[in-house]
């Protein structure tokens, strides 16, 4: 990928990758820590990737030609709260790299943007 996708296409592409039987997911350490901290599980991430929506513009990823997208969704384990997942898709590899997972209601109260977080670690 060399050009970022708009929100609608990003939603469709991420959902398509997430539903592909060849899907491979990697989790950055930060994402694994946030999942544990928030009491969320892998199936919550999969649900959000398969059924969520991208509403925000992407940010460049550290991997050249790739971009970070935030996909948002309520999940079976999140109660009435929505989660946001910052993900770097690699369509040709059928790979989704999870950078972080957040509660959107907490994110909206904090200055700054997690989508700007580095996806290196």
Predicted regions and their residues:
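Ribonuclease/tRNase effector modules and their secretory precursors
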Residues: 1-121
